[in-house]
Amino acid sequence: MTVSPTSAPTQAIDTVERAATTPDEPQPFGELGLKDDEYQRIREILGRRPTDTELAMYSVMWSEHCSYKSSKVHLRYFGETTTDEMRAGMLAGIGENAGVVDIGDGWAVTFKVESHNHPSYVEPYQGAATGVGGIVRDIMAMGARPVAVMDQLRFGAADAPDTRRVLDGVVRGIGGYGNSLGLPNIGGETVFDACYAGNPLVNAMCVGVLRQEDLHLAFASGAGNKIILFGARTGLDGIGGVSVLASDTFDAENSRKKLPSVQVGDPFMEKVLIECCLELYAGGLVIGIQDLGGAGLACATSELASAGDGGMEVRLEAVPLRTAGMTPAEVLCSESQERMCAVVTPENVDAFLAVCRKWDVLATVIGEVTDGDRLRITWHGQTVVDVPPRTVAHEGPVYQRPLARPDTQDALNADSSARLPRPATGAELRATLLALLGSPHLCSRAFITEQYDRYVRGNTVLAEHADGGVLRVDETTGRGIAVSTDASGRYTMLDPYAGAQLALAEAYRNVAVTGATPVAVTNCLNFGSPEDPAVMWQFAQAVRGLADGCVALGIPVTGGNVSFYNQTGSAAILPTPVVGVLGVLDDVSRRLPTALGAEPGETLMLLGETRDEFDGSVWAQVTADHLGGLPPKVDLAREKLLAEVLRAASRDGLVSAAHDLSEGGLAQAVVEAALAGETGCRIVLPEDADPFVTLFSESAGRVLVAVPRTEESRFRSMCEARGLPAVRIGVVDQASDEVEVQGLFTVSLAELRQTSESVLPRLFG
């Protein structure tokens, strides 16, 4: 059913005039998530009680999801630590819809990662699908063409009954929406852990490309300019959706009752909306633009007005509806998908509407910019909102939540994995390799990723088997980008500061192994309840670790997202800071793949230092269900050096393949690279080395590289000159169909592939 415009109201409307004369009328502020003191502050701001519509507007905009009221005091540290040198290539940063970075030759890239965790548990398909749609619109709002997506997924234990429901819906939602948009999914992670059983994480990243002169920002400027709402009609779906779902914890009784709060997406509407926006930008028809996501029009109007140089008047009855009888508060706070709001000069309105008609996109003038400082919203001539917009969008409550190192932290850190029995014989080491490879933690993700289109649009250079996704940006010069996202809740649980830096280091390294230069960071910080001092300690430590790490690497945080209340009852998830890193390649033809066997008889070399580090490792998890001790040491100066060597080696043709070492250590990296290249190899461990430590340690800052035989001497000299440890550990044998660890064990590629690829189909097929 479509309804437009709305008919005159048949029920009494709570107007500003009425609110001023009924100061004692009870209002359900608590049911809307507002605290007593927050409600009193709204009354002080307005000098009266809020109308029902104003109350709804403040409640969604002052929610944890929209206002960052518990995290803002800590997030400021990102800005405080970012130097002018780090900002040099940043065209838009924290506070905008997405960060934008100069990548050279007049090109810019915008990228951001956001969460849609809570909706994806309540209704996995639509929760995940609209998570993709929302982050894509953030990228569109910067003036860019979206070119790729990635995802970071966390589910409960792989064999838990509800994991099948959630995983199936989430994967179908991501694939269904992204594939329909024609956007390649170029990477990500899927992790299983019991702590995510009631709180899955669905963090979606989108990357967009634009010419620097096409950059657009969200602001309403110029009195008399028109406000145009365009895209899908507005309905009841998503009322109080992500803004409310993401601002509370779940319990077993109410999670399924929250279904109506999950938005419903239409990827085909979004696809034409993308093309419509790009034509509007190309025609110079847009002054400012804002996508409609969490909190809907309440967010878009207040943010546009507060970022501009005037006020705004909106006629809410002009909003095209698809549901009859909606109240002003429902229209204002609906989170219906595939909608955008633009500021357009009067002389360009007709041209703007004509472009929208061409693309069959519904567009309606709903208001104008004023020369005042108020946001006024009317409903059939009656004023239902009259507020200072900054108090809604930017001046909400800010809390310095109590934080405290958990009493259990010392015991957790003292419980080292060193006490666990270790494999020693060749047979035991072989069994360990197969146990890790055949676990849900390290097995092939092909069952999931094959549901995504990785190469649509034809610009994907690396995706399958790659540490970082690589995209071509400029067909003429070959300029391109590499992106990666990483996280480790287990390491962050052991040490939040170091855990965040380890996630940053791995994402940075995953970009570096493609041959790209890392240039910028985005993040999505997933934690439990901010009302728990232990959670806030984890959060504060992780923020400082990430910010300090970025300073050490010389790359800025361009934006991000915080997701709190990821817990069921008192049980929080593992603290999970997701870090995305963007890198630049001058020529994508020189990118480094993961697969071995590109050159006959390649030499395998291990870069970096291997230490006895197993606390928080997958080995400890799989063999003993153990989590304790201290995470691996992180050396960001060494990470930076490693990236410089890989970039130079890629440029000079000294390396033919590279693969990051992370979970599962060297053994897992060798297996993945051999399977990717469908070639055998022989590994020769150093004589004085402990085979178990060499094969399975998860020490950071290490990369497996394949070096053409003719370039081994030059590459070794390059590493020696720069002080980077480089050890020859074997050769690629294209005539072999086995991975051999000399003197210890041999495993056929067929057995490795079967072990790895059979796990997820058996669990979820």
From Swiss-Prot:
ATP binds at residues 68, 112, 523, 560. Pathway: Purine metabolism; IMP biosynthesis via de novo pathway; 5-amino-1-(5-phospho-D-ribosyl)imidazole from N(2)-formyl-N(1)-(5-phospho-D-ribosyl)glycinamide: step 1/2. This is Phosphoribosylformylglycinamidine synthase subunit PurL. Its EC number is 6.3.5.3. Pfam families: AIRS, AIRS_C, FGAR-AT_linker. Substrate binds at residues 115-118, 137, 263, 335-337, 563. It catalyses: N(2)-formyl-N(1)-(5-phospho-beta-D-ribosyl)glycinamide + L-glutamine + ATP + H2O = 2-formamido-N(1)-(5-O-phospho-beta-D-ribosyl)acetamidine + L-glutamate + ADP + phosphate + H(+). The keyword Nucleotide-binding applies. Residues 1-13 have a biased composition (Polar residues). Keywords: ATP-binding, Cytoplasm, Ligase, Magnesium, Metal-binding, Nucleotide-binding, Purine biosynthesis. Part of the phosphoribosylformylglycinamidine synthase complex involved in the purines biosynthetic pathway. Catalyzes the ATP-dependent conversion of formylglycinamide ribonucleotide (FGAR) and glutamine to yield formylglycinamidine ribonucleotide (FGAM) and glutamate. The FGAM synthase complex is composed of three subunits. PurQ produces an ammonia molecule by converting glutamine to glutamate. PurL transfers the ammonia molecule to FGAR to form FGAM in an ATP-dependent manner. It comes from Mycobacterium avium (strain 104). GO terms for cellular component: cytoplasm.
